[in-house]
Amino acid sequence: GLPTCGETCFGGTCNTPGCTCDPWPVCTHN
């Protein structure tokens, strides 16, 4: 879930590889 990927995901998806939209709306490395 952390650290953050420097990307937001209001649409529910992250473009950064290896990152998930959790906690919404912040992309974090899973």
Curated annotation (Swiss-Prot):
It comes from Viola odorata. This is Cycloviolacin-O24. GO terms for biological process: defense response; killing of cells of another organism. Belongs to the cyclotide family. Moebius subfamily. Disulfide bonds join 5-19, 9-21, 14-27. Probably participates in a plant defense mechanism. Has hemolytic activity. It comes from the Eukaryota. It holds the Pfam family Cyclotide. The presence of a 'disulfide through disulfide knot' structurally defines this protein as a knottin. This is a cyclic peptide. The keyword Disulfide bond applies. There is a cross-link at residues 1-30 (Cyclopeptide (Gly-Asn)). Expressed in leaves but not in petals, petioles, roots and runners (at protein level). Keywords: Cytolysis, Disulfide bond, Hemolysis, Knottin, Plant defense.
